[in-house]
């Protein structure tokens, strides 16, 4: 029997509606709407599309969105000055710096200068550290979005074997921490992992984020597993494909995310959720 499709678009829309209702209640109570600053450096086409979707999502839920589009030749010191300004702006609850940044700008330095209480991407070492200590506040958007999908579909995590393929700072590493927090036994696979197939065949929950189309053969999937495909890759044909061989995996898995329409929409929805959380918990004066 083919797997049940995990509809990320539907769940993301539900999350946005929930946030919009809370924002409406805030405003009706005389409180200000949450504010999100979106910073884009350069004119990378993919980044422009992502930023546009984030700004649109802000407007839909009633946030105040401030846009800062900087030229590609912006110096690091100039970007840091803007971040420092936004850190002290009491009407800004979240600061989002769209990645990747142009060559010559130290991404780590930029992200570490964002006030951790405005780090709605969840990338700051302080917030990742809180997650590792089981006291999370602002959590990385894609991993948290995946946890939301599992929760909304009532897919059990506690006591299950979760295998994460990919160890990036944006997805793989915080995803491992999220799975630990949820009570899973976790295995994280990366480029030095030997016998990848062996690990994947053990996975009750498989999360793949490597950025290579059809990297995981579908017949490696354990019968009845949950497959979360974070990859989004454009093929020569123009079609989008995930990191997992979808058609074959779907016949073995119990649940599976499609590409597109699975994890992607949840990343933006969680960003919106984080911004409201930052407003309510840190800046609601």
Curated annotation (Swiss-Prot):
Q: What does this protein do?
A: Catalyzes the oxidation of 5,10-methylenetetrahydrofolate to 5,10-methenyltetrahydrofolate and then the hydrolysis of 5,10-methenyltetrahydrofolate to 10-formyltetrahydrofolate.
**A Gene Ontology biological process term:** L-histidine biosynthetic process
**What InterPro entries does this protein's entry cite?**
Aminoacid_DH-like_N_sf, NAD(P)-bd_dom_sf, THF_DH/CycHdrlase, THF_DH/CycHdrlase_cat_dom, THF_DH/CycHdrlase_CS, THF_DH/CycHdrlase_NAD-bd_dom
PANTHER family, sorted: C-1-TETRAHYDROFOLATE SYNTHASE, CYTOPLASMIC, C-1-TETRAHYDROFOLATE SYNTHASE, CYTOPLASMIC-RELATED
NCBIfam families, alphabetized: PRK10792.1, PRK14186.1
EC nos: 1.5.1.5, 3.5.4.9
Per UniProt, the keywords (alphabetical) are: Amino-acid biosynthesis, Histidine biosynthesis, Hydrolase, Methionine biosynthesis, Multifunctional enzyme, NADP, One-carbon metabolism, Oxidoreductase, Purine biosynthesis
| Protein name, as recorded | Bifunctional protein FolD
Q: Which PROSITE patterns match?
A: THF_DHG_CYH_1 (PS00766), THF_DHG_CYH_2 (PS00767)
Q: Which organism is it from?
A: Photobacterium profundum (strain SS9)
């Amino acid at each position: 029997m083919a797997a049940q499709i995990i509809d990320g678009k539907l769940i993301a829309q539900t999350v946005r509606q929930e946030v919009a209702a809370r924002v409406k209640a805030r405003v009706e109570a005389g409180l200000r709407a949450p504010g999100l600053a979106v910073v884009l450096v350069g004119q990378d086409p993919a980044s422009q599309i992502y930023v546009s979707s984030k700004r649109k999502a802000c407007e839909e839920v009633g946030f105040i969105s401030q846009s800062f589009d900087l030229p590609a030749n912006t110096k690091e010191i100039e970007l840091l000055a803007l971040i420092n300004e936004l850190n002290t702006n009491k009407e800004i609850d979240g600061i989002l710096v769209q990645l990747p940044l142009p060559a010559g700008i130290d991404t780590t330095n930029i992200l570490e200068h964002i006030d951790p209480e405005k780090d709605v991407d969840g990338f700051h070492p302080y917030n990742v550290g809180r997650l590792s200590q089981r006291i999370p506040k602002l959590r990385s958007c894609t991993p948290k979005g995946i946890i939301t999908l599992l929760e909304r579909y009532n897919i059990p995590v506690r006591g299950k074997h979760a295998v994460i393929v990919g160890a990036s700072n944006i997805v793989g590493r915080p995803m491992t921490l999220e799975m630990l927090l949820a009570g899973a036994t976790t295995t994280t696979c990366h480029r030095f992992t030997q016998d990848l197939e062996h690990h994947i065949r053990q996975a009750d929950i498989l999360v793949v984020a490597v950025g290579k189309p059809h990297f995981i053969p579908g017949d490696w999937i354990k019968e009845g597993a949950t497959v979360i495909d974070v990859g989004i890759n454009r093929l020569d044909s123009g079609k989008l494909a995930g990191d997992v061989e979808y058609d074959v995996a779907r016949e073995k898995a119990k649940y599976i995310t499609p590409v597109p329409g699975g994890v992607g929409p949840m990343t933006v929805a969680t960003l919106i959720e984080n911004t409201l959380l930052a407003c309510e918990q840190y800046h609601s004066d």
